[in-house]
Amino acid sequence: MAKRDYYEVLGVKKDADEREIKKAYKRLAVKYHPDRNQDENDTGENFKEVKEAYEILTDPQKRAAYDQYGHAAFEQGGMGGGGFGGGGADFTDIFGDVFGDIFGGGRRQRASRGSDLRYNMDLTLEEAVRGVTKEIRIPTLNECDVCHGSGAKPGSSPVTCSTCRGAGQVHMRQGFFTVQQACPTCHGSGQIIKDPCNKCHGHGRVEKSKTLSVKIPAGVDTGDRIRLSGEGEAGEHGAPAGDLYVQVQVKAHPIFEREGNNLYCEVPINFAMAALGGEIEVPTLDGRVKLKVPAETQTGKLFRMRGKGVKSVRGGSQGDLLCRVVVETPVHLSEKQKQLLRELEESFVGAAGEKNSPRSKSFLDGVKKFFDDLTR
C-alpha cells in the first residue's frame, strides 16, 4: 500500500513551522499511543506512521530531502516500508525527547545540572521593611557523600562505554543520511557503572534535608524572589547543582497597607476634633509621631508624612506614610452628651446654620431642583 504524505499524516500544511508540527504530533501521539488507545482494531500502525512523519519533518535536512524527492529519499536501507527497526532511530529517543513527561519515559542525557528549587517564605511587614535573616530547612537531592557523586562504589570507577567509546552518542544510517542519537547502552552518559555505590545505588545523589541561613534584604515585597546560587538539587554524577529561589510573601498587617514603597493607614478622629482641629498621635514603623489636624477636616482627607514609608530594596528613595482620616460618629452617649448635641443641632437650623454644613446645603439644593424639574 502506498505511503501517505507526511504532511497529510500530521494534518499540517507544507509550509508549517516546527511549532505547528510538534503541536500536531503531540495531539496525534496521545490519540494513537498504544498505552492510551483502546481501539482493538488499531494495530499500532497509525502511531508508527505519525511518529515517522514527525521525525522526518522536524529534521531540517530530512525535510528538505523529503520535499524534493518524496518517500524515495528514504527507501535505501533506512526507513523503507515505514519500519523503524534495523538502522532506524530508537523509538524511546524520538518520542521521549518531546513527550517523556506525558508517558513517564524520555531518554537519559549526559550528566546534567541539578534542578532548581523554590521555597515560599512568609514575612511580616516589619521583617520585609527592615530586612531579616531566617533559617530554612528544605528537602532536596544532595551529592552522595560516599561516592561523591560518581555513583560508583568507593575504590571503583565508572568505565568507558564500549558501545559509544565514551562519546555518549552513536551514528545510525538512515537513507541518504547518517544521524546521531543517544547511545542505547549508556543512555548518553558515555560511562557504565559496573559496581554501584551501596548508599545511592549508582545515582550519585541521595535525598536529604539541609538547613540554610537566608538573608532577606530590607524593602522586599510580595512577589520578589531571592536566588541562592548552587543551593538547589545536586547535579547528576558531579554536574553543577541547581539554584534555590526564595519566593517572598508578605502577610497582611493589622494597621498598614503597602503600595509600592508607600504605606497607608486609616486614622479615626472624633467629630469635635474634625471640626475644631487638634493634634493626634499616629503609628509609624519607627514609633509614634505627632500629626496636626486642621479645623474643618473631613473624612477621607489624606495627610502625607514624607520618608516614613519603605526604603526601596534597590537603595536610594524611601516611600511615604499616608494617613487617611475617618471622622467617627460617637456611640454610647450619656444623657448629658445627647442634650449637648441637640443644642448643637438646633444651632444649625435656618440660614445661620447653612454655612456650617455647605456640602449638606448644596446636596439639599440639588435634590430640591431635581424634584422641581420632575414636576414641571
Swiss-Prot record:
BP terms from Gene Ontology: chaperone cofactor-dependent protein refolding; DNA replication; protein refolding; response to heat
Location of the protein in the cell: Cytoplasm
Stretches forming CXXCXGXG motif repeats: 144-151, 161-168, 183-190, 197-204
Lineage: superkingdom: Bacteria
ZnF region ranges: CR-type: 131-209
Acetylation listed as a keyword: no
Matching PROSITE patterns: DNAJ_1, DNAJ_2, ZF_CR
Cofactor: Zn(2+)
List of residues binding Zn(2+) 1: C144, C147, C197, C200
Domain J: 5-70
Family annotation (Gene3D superfamilies): DnaJ domain (1.10.287.110), Heat shock protein DnaJ, cysteine-rich domain (2.10.230.10), Urease metallochaperone UreE, N-terminal domain (2.60.260.20)
Bound cofactor: record note: Binds 2 Zn(2+) ions per monomer.
Main location: cytoplasm
Function field: Participates actively in the response to hyperosmotic and heat shock by preventing the aggregation of stress-denatured proteins and by disaggregating proteins, also in an autonomous, DnaK-independent fashion. Unfolded proteins bind initially to DnaJ; upon interaction with the DnaJ-bound protein, DnaK hydrolyzes its bound ATP, resulting in the formation of a stable complex. GrpE releases ADP from DnaK; ATP binding to DnaK triggers the release of the substrate protein, thus completing the reaction cycle.
Comment text on domains: The J domain is necessary and sufficient to stimulate DnaK ATPase activity. Zinc center 1 plays an important role in the autonomous, DnaK-independent chaperone activity of DnaJ. Zinc center 2 is essential for interaction with DnaK and for DnaJ activity.
Family membership: Belongs to the DnaJ family.
Protein name: Chaperone protein DnaJ
Organism: Yersinia enterocolitica serotype O:8 / biotype 1B (strain NCTC 13174 / 8081)
Classification of source organism: Bacteria, Pseudomonadati, Pseudomonadota, Gammaproteobacteria, Enterobacterales
